[in-house]
């Protein structure tokens, strides 16, 4: 008989780059999870915007099992039917002409930045290597992407960092304009800064970036790792803004919980990447591709995308009512089912404590820095699950407020 597993085993065996919750989930269905002791949680964290169709969705299980019974992996010396079908679905649904598959958002962003540098080098010369990104951004944990992310706490211990990356203020087109010039090869931006506090870009800001990139022959990269695949109520957030990037990165919800990432590119951009210029062992493997193909099939429908907008209203209405009672938040913001509740000055820096109280009450939420409680639930979360989960969240807020005033 195998040894029982406990949360303490994490502290014994794992490299301590995470600080997981004190409970261990063991089973999920829809927007509900159960831990080792059988306690139920409503899941509004969604694996950090990954579980777009909830846990153990029957059609995703079927797609995975069907492919698993055929073959799992061949490597990039061969292609496969599921990955080609998935590529065609993404191309048909977006601006893209070409796709590169990988395993995560960080890998997709790494590929995008490498492509941008090579595109500029091949077309304009080695002087055009500058990358403009934004303060409080998050683009992944590779050395290149953590340098592009404008959060020194994630990068300062790993110097020397890749050179020629500068950071402007987000949503400030004048700040960006001061940095973007003819030496810039690319601008990388999140349409909504997720880890940076659930901060949506303004239309004028993204349109201004498009114009600056056009003027200076720089590529515009949209990091849609968190906002993509229906999260905002459109298949990709760029569709809200009417601003089309040259490159787009996607991951998280694309696999519905199965690891997969992708870089979407125009034909003009893609042609600079030739055999051997980039690659990955597992990217585009048939298991991930089969699942992701089913995810796109289920999410890219008017019913599902309109349902996300309806669910946004459910959340915001109930969160506003809750906030009227407890006075925790100065602002509730976001698009679709990526929602951030900004703590007011009286509770600044205590988002983690609220998330811990929420877990005790049986609801899982995220944070985005010390001042924002973040919600990224399944796109098909039911109204009953929203009501039950927010009732539990209200109980957690009541306990948090009463504890602070006692």
UniProtKB/Swiss-Prot annotation:
The keyword Ubl conjugation does not apply. It is an enzyme of class 2 (transferase). Pathway: Amino-acid degradation; L-arginine degradation via AST pathway; L-glutamate and succinate from L-arginine: step 3/5. Its cofactor is pyridoxal 5'-phosphate. Its EC number is 2.6.1.81. GO terms for biological process: alpha-amino acid biosynthetic process; arginine catabolic process to glutamate; arginine catabolic process to succinate; ornithine catabolic process. The modification N6-(pyridoxal phosphate)lysine is found at residue 252. Belongs to the class-III pyridoxal-phosphate-dependent aminotransferase family. AstC subfamily. This is Succinylornithine transaminase. The gene is astC.
